Amino acid sequence: MFTTIKKTVIGLFTIVRSMWMVNSHAIRPRDTILYPEVPVPVPPRFRGRIILSRDPDGDERCVACNLCAVACPVGCISLQKAEREDGRWYPEFFRINFSRCIFCGLCEEACPTTAIQMTPDFEMSEYVRQDLVYEKEHLLISGPGKYPDYNYYRVTGMAVADKPKGAAQNEAAPIDLRSLLP
């Protein structure tokens, strides 16, 4: 008789506890969100879609050095180098296959000109796989991106067309080493 009462009390406690849990979850805020209507919060350093940025002057920053394609662990970046009349290199074509990209950010780290930048945009779903191959026209943006004042050619000291050494902006005239000899 004692075991029957014990089993009945344990059974009632289990039922009351289960009902309490169900009712407490009914009034709690929902864990799931309605995705298209409610935007997903992304962290500040989120690595999303890749873009190609421009210099503050408006020229494209990419010098087709191919470091991004070499750094990519899955080989989803391909480009071909060409040269302008002033001697500056540029990519004739720049192609990223986002169906293979793992968004690791190694291409952004390898880029010496900060042309490749990762954005927080992650909505790139397509019905056709070939639409995930982005060309240079799709990747280029009109602004400088994350680094608005950075210009690769000014930082590296590359010769500016139609200006001798030392005549460019923020550049000192070269020193004559023979004048320093005793």
Curated annotation (Swiss-Prot):
Report the subcellular localization: Cell inner membrane
Domain (4Fe-4S ferredoxin-type) ranges: 50-82, 92-121
Q: Does the keyword Cell inner membrane apply?
A: yes
Q: Which UniProt keywords apply?
A: 4Fe-4S, Cell inner membrane, Cell membrane, Iron, Iron-sulfur, Membrane, Metal-binding, NAD, Quinone, Repeat, Translocase, Ubiquinone
- Catalytic activity annotated for this protein? a quinone + NADH + 5 H(+)(in) = a quinol + NAD(+) + 4 H(+)(out)
Question: Which cofactors is this protein said to need?
Answer: [4Fe-4S] cluster
- Tell me a GO biological process for this protein: aerobic respiration
Q: What biological function has been recorded for the protein in this entry?
A: NDH-1 shuttles electrons from NADH, via FMN and iron-sulfur (Fe-S) centers, to quinones in the respiratory chain. The immediate electron acceptor for the enzyme in this species is believed to be ubiquinone. Couples the redox reaction to proton translocation (for every two electrons transferred, four hydrogen ions are translocated across the cytoplasmic membrane), and thus conserves the redox energy in a proton gradient.
Protein name as it appears in the record: NADH-quinone oxidoreductase subunit I
Organism from which the protein derives: Psychrobacter arcticus (strain DSM 17307 / VKM B-2377 / 273-4)
